[in-house]
Amino acid sequence: MNSPDRFAAISDIHGNLHALEAVLARIRSMADIEITVNLGDILSGPIEPAATADLLISLDLPTIRGNHERQLLDCARAPGGASDQFAFEETTASHRSWIAALPATLPLGEDVLLSHGTPHDDLEYLLETVTPGGCRLASGEEVASRLGAVRRSLILCGHSHVPRAVSLADGTLVVNPGSVGIQAYTADQPFPHEIANGSPHARFAVCERGPHGWSVSQHMVAYDWDRAAETAQRHGRPDWASRLLSGRNEA
């Protein structure tokens, strides 16, 4: 696949069909978007995983898998976490075959690379560092170290849900478009930490090649988060419902 000159990036949908539809509508309204790419963590969550899969399969976007795709498929062998297990039980064998065929990384031409976490590990944040004291933004040196020998003009990642762009010393631009589906969560590994973007808006990014290199614009989209939260509540996840409404982790 050739590298596009202007494209949208989405990530971490987590089965939130309402947010995804709003983001895709916004992207369609924008001029000269050649493609939309999807950076993984697609279905796991207590909202509408099957309908989300149906929509994305029909669109046939360039898509990679995230850690939650692995975890969802692992539910065939043993019960998984609540979000993965719910998505596994709601989806069909056809949906899961689609997930299983997704690549871990995907190049767009010679100068753009799609990854979920780092290019080597879908569970490791690329642009954040987790310590015993919590989560902080990673330094340029930390980002470069996690990339190892991988270099492109533009590298896209997801996983952390935090919209951010970092320019490295060698000119590489690393972009996280943020999360379409959920703006706050807590995690236990490698140390307990939390992420909270502070508003419920769905996030995506637009990357554009110019005469002096790549530029990025980050976007926030309002959608019917009340409906998404009601669905999560109905599926027994008041924790998700609260986060969907606020973009924060407190009750």
PLM segments and residue spans:
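Active-site-proximal beta-strand elements of phosphoester/diester hydrolases
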Residues: D5-H14, D111-H120, V174-P177
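Active-site environment of divalent metal-dependent phosphoester hydrolases
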Residues: H14-H18, S44-I47, H68-D74, P107, ...
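A short acidic, glycine-rich active-site loop
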Residues: Q85-E90, P132-E141, E194-N197
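Redox-cofactor binding/interface segments in oxidoreductases and associated redox assembly factors
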Residues: N38, C157, N176
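His/acidic metal-ligating clusters that form di-metal
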Residues: M30-D32, S94-V166
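Core catalytic region of metal-dependent phosphoesterases/phosphodiesterases
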Residues: S3-A100
